[in-house]
From Swiss-Prot:
Organism: Synechococcus sp. (strain CC9605)
GO molecular function: ADP binding; ATP binding; phosphoglycerate kinase activity
Gene for this chain: pgk
E.C. designation(s): 2.7.2.3
Protein name: Phosphoglycerate kinase
GO biological process: gluconeogenesis; glycolytic process
Length: 401
């Protein structure tokens, strides 16, 4: 069901109004507490700037890390407020706590167009328990709710779901709207042929998404460590590669389902092997039918890259979730980088390319190709759950369009 968006609210609706905006500012920090990647902060700027422009009082709510319901000084949002202030070119006040006297005082002192960042909502255990009393206090700071935190939309927490019971309208921000448009659109109404590339080390974490994609796609390409569970299920020798022994039957079922559905399910034909799990390991390329004992597969091989490129050539929509190998090690990054380059080229030819969150986003950014893709999802678990066809609580709670 389509959701009401911030675009439906004009300056007349928002000027002078206190607007609670749930954002995803869970950014990586280094040892000195400096932000190493501000992508998530930048991703929220269109929504924040739109609200400032419409004269709203912008109250931002976010979580950071996993403080387990207790105040943890290392997980305060102080560096985030400083970076956001630089990006907006205006001061951003930060509260000492997300509810209580300090938050009320700082919100009460706001002028139209001001921005306040509430302290980490997860300092309260009630946030993750979606406790109604806590949600009501948080909502009590505002009059309108905007959810722009797609990365947290698969959680029914107080700041993503509970507050909507006390604030109307409750609408999707621009980032949330774009995520839903691309990810839901790709699964529900794709331009075909539709291909999905699924990587990563474990079948167990991608079962739901593989199962759904085999129902929806024309082609499914599988890479990453999970391929060895499929090979072992076929009776092949995989050396000391990663295998989930308890998922062998499932791998057989997924292959059988693809065949029954007339879906092209492609696994690599060759792999790059290492003698141990290290960036400087000795390596060799082998056909999947000839993996020697004592070696482990850490990337897809050159022949597989060609096969995958040929399969993708005529596709109009491609969803990619999960790397082809251990791309963190340069020696085993070729498969992942080649797929990234292929998708960038396809984008240039009018194919809709969607990078579905998680490690594939890091891989595309590392390859310097992020700008070339149609859409890069900011969600990890949320992207997977949406692609699985699950209802996300943070989305379901918003007003209907």
């Amino acid at each position: 069901m389509a959701k009401r968006s911030l675009a439906s609210l004009n300056a007349g609706d928002l000027s002078g109004k206190r607007v609670l905006v749930r954002v995803d500012f869970n950014v990586p920090l280094n040892d000195t507490g400096a932000i190493t990647d501000d992508t998530r902060i930048r991703a929220a700027l269109p929504t924040i700037n739109d609200l400032i422009g419409k004269g709203a009082k912008v109250i931002l709510s976010a979580h950071f890390g996993r403080p387990k319901g207790q105040v943890n000084d290392a997980m305060r949002l102080t560096p985030v407020a400083a970076r956001l202030s630089e990006l907006l070119g205006k001061p951003v006040a930060k509260t000492d706590s997300c509810i209580g006297p300090d938050a009320e005082a700082k919100v009460g002192a706001m002028a139209n167009g001001d921005v306040v960042l509430l302290e980490n909502v997860r300092f309260f255990a009630e946030e993750e328990k979606n406790e109604a009393g806590f949600a009501e206090k948080l909502a009590g700071l505002a009059e309108v709710y905007v959810n722009d935190a797609f990365g947290a939309a698969h959680r029914a927490h107080a700041s993503t779901e509970g507050v909507t019971k006390f604030l109307k309208p409750s609408v999707a921000g621009f980032l949330m709207e774009k995520e839903l448009q691309y990810l839901q659109g790709a699964v529900d109404e794709p331009k075909r042929p539709l291909a999905a590339i699924v990587g990563g080390s474990k079948v167990s974490s991608k079962i739901g998404v593989l199962d759904t994609l085999i129902d929806k796609c024309d082609k499914v390409l599988i890479g990453g460590g999970m391929i060895f569970t499929f090979y072992k299920a076929r009776g092949l020798s995989v050396g000391k590669s990663l295998v989930e022994e308890d998922k062998l039957e499932l791998a057989k079922e997924l292959e059988a389902k693809a065949k029954a559905n007339g879906v092209q399910l492609l696994l690599p034909t060759d792999v790059v092997l290492a003698d141990n799990f290290a960036p400087d390991a000795n390596s060799q390329t082998a056909d999947i039918n000839a993996i020697p004992d004592g070696w482990m597969g850490l990337d897809i091989g050159p022949d597989s890259i060609k096969v995958f490129q040929e399969a993708l050539a005529d596709c109009q929509t491609v969803i990619w979730n999960g790397p082809m190998g251990v791309f963190e090690f340069d020696k085993f990054a070729t498969g992942t980088n080649s797929i990234a380059t292929t998708l960038a080229d396809l984008s240039g030819k009018g194919c809709c390319t969607i990078i579905g969150g998680g490690d594939s986003v890091a891989a595309v950014e590392k390859a310097g190709l992020a700008e070339k893709m149609s859409h890069i999802s900011t969600g990890g678990g949320a992207s997977l759950e949406l692609l699985e066809g699950k209802v996300l609580p943070g989305v379901a709670a918003l007003d209907a369009a």
